[in-house]
């Protein structure tokens, strides 16, 4: 099952020693059977995710997901991630989306279906282990469901990241991400890692079969969807603002060239404003040099709550 490519770069991944019985989907280490993460820990944290979905629909979705996973594994394994070598007839919308995400995010595949474990109770296979352009380790899970359950996949990948670092003592996971692949739609979502304390509580509850345990995501439900919408809007707005500035510069140059002060059109008026100098009041300097005067002419006002957002470049 495990497909590792140690020839890409100088990152070498360790063998966990876990044996996977693919026909029965069971994991073994030294004769002891280990539990899969999704069927135990994720199920305990999110027990009712698929309760209202008919089994036939779940089976069809699982089959579709297996096909997508297999095509990605073949692309990275047999064809070494070279899209020029991949057979034209085997391309799918999902695979094209996948390749686009890999290129956009500067990723290279180190291993597919890479098995990690805590060497005691659990084992699972990570869909893809990647290195980014800086050599940082990125763990990726592929999802093909109609709805992306951000909180669930964030927990799943956080557990994988912990086990990955246990198997590979000298390596640290830089980030975890989900590739959502659904027809010609695709989305690359970088997720936050769940803290070790929360993972400890979940594992303890599962091992003790604690029926009173209830998982509470550190990042509440619905946040990631809003985050992604905000990021996409910000990128679109940023691109439009750049285009708008470029067009304004061209209009300004055209008006200069024609010595025009103003154009009035059906859309509005365009007025050339010549360069000038201005003055700005330095309130910080006044506060430093004459604090009594500054206090005399300032007044307090109520400022409404706001949100400060700093996106990664």
Q: Where in this protein do the model-derived segments appear?
A:
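Short, conserved glycine- and acidic-residue-centered signature motifs
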Residues: 153-156
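Conserved catalytic cores of phosphodiester-cleaving nucleases, focusing on short active-site segments
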Residues: 68-69, 124-146, 160, 233
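Short, mixed charged/polar active-site loops
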Residues: 121-123, 137, 186-188
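Metal-dependent nuclease catalytic regions and adjoining charged, substrate-binding loops involved
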Residues: 151, 162-253, 259
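Extended, charge-rich alpha-helical segments
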Residues: 98, 232, 238-313
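Short, flexible loop/turn elements at secondary-structure junctions
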Residues: 114-116, 130-132, 144-146, 180, ...
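Metal-dependent nuclease catalytic cores that hydrolyze phosphodiester bonds in DNA/RNA
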Residues: 1-123, 249
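Short glycine/serine/proline-enriched coil/turn segments at secondary-structure junctions
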Residues: 118-122, 149, 168
């Amino acid at each position: 099952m495990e497909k590792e490519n140690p020839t890409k770069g100088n990152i070498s991944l360790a063998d966990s020693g876990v044996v996977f019985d693919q026909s029965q989907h069971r994991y073994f280490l030294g004769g002891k059977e280990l539990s899969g993460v999704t069927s135990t820990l994720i199920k305990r944290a999110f027990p009712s995710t698929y309760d209202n979905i008919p089994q036939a629909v779940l089976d069809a979705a699982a089959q579709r997901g297996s096909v997508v996973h297999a095509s990605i594994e073949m692309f990275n394994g047999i064809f070494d991630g070279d899209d020029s070598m991949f057979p034209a007839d085997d391309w799918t919308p999902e695979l094209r989306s996948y390749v686009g995400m890999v290129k956009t995010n500067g990723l290279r595949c180190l291993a597919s279906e890479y098995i990690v474990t805590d060497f005691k109770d659990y084992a699972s296979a990570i869909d893809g282990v990647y290195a980014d352009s800086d050599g940082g380790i990125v763990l990726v899970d592929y999802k093909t469901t109609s709805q992306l359950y951000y909180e669930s996949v964030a927990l799943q990948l956080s557990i994988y990241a912990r086990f990955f670092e246990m198997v590979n003592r000298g390596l640290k996971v830089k980030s975890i991400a989900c590739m959502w692949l659904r027809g010609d739609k695709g989305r690359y979502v970088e997720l936050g890692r769940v803290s070790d304390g929360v993972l400890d509580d979940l594992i303890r509850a599962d091992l003790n079969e604690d029926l009173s345990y209830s998982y509470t995501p550190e990042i509440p439900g619905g946040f990631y969807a809003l985050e992604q919408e905000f990021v996409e809007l910000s990128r679109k707005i940023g691109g439009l603002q750049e285009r708008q500035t470029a067009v304004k510069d061209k209009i300004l140059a055209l008006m200069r060239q024609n010595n025009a002060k103003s154009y009035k059109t059906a859309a509005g008026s365009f007025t050339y404003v010549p360069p000038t100098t201005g003055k700005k009041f330095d309130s910080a300097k006044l506060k430093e040099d004459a604090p009594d005067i500054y206090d005399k002419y300032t007044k307090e006002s109520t400022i409404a709550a706001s949100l400060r957002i700093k996106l990664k470049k």
